[in-house]
UniProtKB/Swiss-Prot annotation:
It comes from Bacillus thuringiensis subsp. konkukian (strain 97-27). This is Arginine regulator. It comes from the Bacteria. Coiled coil: none annotated. The lineage of its organism: Bacteria, Bacillati, Bacillota, Bacilli, Bacillales. Keywords: Arginine metabolism, Cytoplasm, DNA-binding, Transcription, Transcription regulation. GO terms for molecular function: arginine binding; DNA binding; DNA-binding transcription factor activity. GO terms for biological process: arginine catabolic process to ornithine; protein complex oligomerization; regulation of arginine biosynthetic process.
C-alpha cells in the first residue's frame, strides 16, 4: 500500500479512536490488510505531526497537531497584542495584566496551545497567572511572549 493511503488511514484512526500506543495503530492497519512494522508507524507519526495529549480520562493519546493548534497560536498572538497591559514574572510564575474582561480569553488560548512549559493558568477579570514547573520553563514562556508582543 502506498504511503499516502496508509497515512490517511492513520489519521482516520486517530480521529475515530483514542490511540495510546503505536502498536494499536499497527493492529488497526492490519485489520485493513495493511501490514507494517512499528518503526514504519513511528515514522508516519512524525511525518503527520501527531502528538500525545491527555484525553478526558487522563490517558495520553495521539492527536493531529495541525490547523487547530496553528489557529490557536495565531489567535493568541493577535489577542496578546490587543489586550496585554503588562507582564511581570517571578520564579516560576508569570502574571499577565490585561484590559478588563480579557484575562480569561488569554488563559483559554494558553490552555489550547498545551505548551509543555506551562502547568496551569488561573485567570480573573484582568489578570492571568501562568504557572510553570520551574523558573527556566517560565523564562522560555516569557521569551515566546516577548517575540509575539
Amino acid at each position: 500500500m502506498k504511503k499516502e493511503k496508509r497515512q490517511r488511514l492513520i489519521k482516520q484512526f486517530v480521529k475515530e479512536y483514542e490511540i495510546e500506543k503505536q502498536e494499536r495503530l499497527v493492529e488497526l492497519l492490519a485489520k485493513k490488510d495493511v501490514l507494517v512494522t512499528q518503526a514504519t508507524v513511528s515514522r508516519d507519526i512524525r511525518e503527520l505531526n501527531l502528538t500525545k495529549v491527555p484525553s478526558q480520562e487522563g490517558l495520553m493519546i495521539y492527536k493531529i497537531f495541525s490547523e487547530e493548534h496553528l489557529q490557536t497560536d495565531i489567535k493568541l498572538k493577535k489577542k496578546l497584542r490587543e489586550v496585554v497591559v503588562k507582564i511581570d514574572c517571578v520564579e516560576q510564575l508569570m502574571v499577565i495584566k490585561t484590559l478588563p474582561g480579557n484575562a480569561h480569553v488569554i488563559g483559554v488560548l494558553f490552555d489550547e496551545l498545551d505548551w509543555k512549559e506551562k502547568i496551569g493558568c488561573i485567570c480573573g477579570n484582568d489578570t492571568c497567572l501562568i504557572i510553570s514547573q520551574s523558573k527556566s520553563d517560565r523564562e522560555i514562556l516569557e521569551e515566546r511572549l516577548n517575540l509575539i508582543i
